[in-house]
UniProtKB/Swiss-Prot annotation:
PROSITE patterns: OMPR_PHOB, RESPONSE_REGULATORY. The lineage of its organism: Bacteria, Pseudomonadati, Pseudomonadota, Gammaproteobacteria, Enterobacterales. The keyword Chaperone does not apply. It holds the Pfam family Trans_reg_C. The keyword Phosphoprotein applies. Transmembrane segments: none annotated. CDD domains: REC_OmpR_PmrA-like, trans_reg_C. GO terms for biological process: regulation of DNA-templated transcription. NCBIfam families: PRK10336.1. This is Transcriptional regulatory protein QseB. Disulfide bonds: none annotated. It comes from Salmonella typhimurium (strain LT2 / SGSC1412 / ATCC 700720). Keywords: Activator, Cytoplasm, DNA-binding, Phosphoprotein, Transcription, Transcription regulation, Two-component regulatory system.
Amino acid sequence: MRILLVEDDTLIGDGIKAGLSKMGFSVDWFTEGRPGKEALYSAPYDAVILDLTLPGMDGRDILREWREKGKQEPVLILTARDALAERVEGLRLGADDYLCKPFALIEVAARLEALVRRASGQASSELRHGQVTLNPGNLVATLAGEPLALKPKEFALLELLLRNKGRVLPRKLIEEKLYNWDDDVSSNAVEVHVHHLRRKLGSEFIRTVHGIGYTLGDA
């Protein structure tokens, strides 16, 4: 899951990025309003964490512009502003959730997962295809009831495929979802992760659509 983080406090931002990365998220972090605003137009993010008090451009103005221009990515406002009127204003501008500082990182992750789940029309946090189940909340995947030992990028790729059943995902899109701008990505990184998942889940679990990308095989 790829997350856009716009937060000017370096201590908080570094903690969020490091913590979410350990949980399997891919995070791009911006400390100023305008670059953060523009980032949403240049990469396929699953959700956004947006602070309100930002240098260069206020978070509320950023959110207003995104919604006016049709950007529908779920937005979690994370801010020290805890006045009721400001929370209501943020939600009415188009925010999907609101969390006041201080916060627990596990709650940030849980709220992001809930936002993405609602945006994709999924009622349950558990994803399933055939004998494979995956729970993003506790980072557990199973095959026929037995735990699967997956590396973080393998888990992220499996989650991406399960959230997009019936769709063919272009290789470039998969790469953009799995990696942030700071990552050093080899040219065959996606193919390597697909190969490893097939070894663990079966060769027919992921189907290659030549010239396009990958999709789930028959359950």
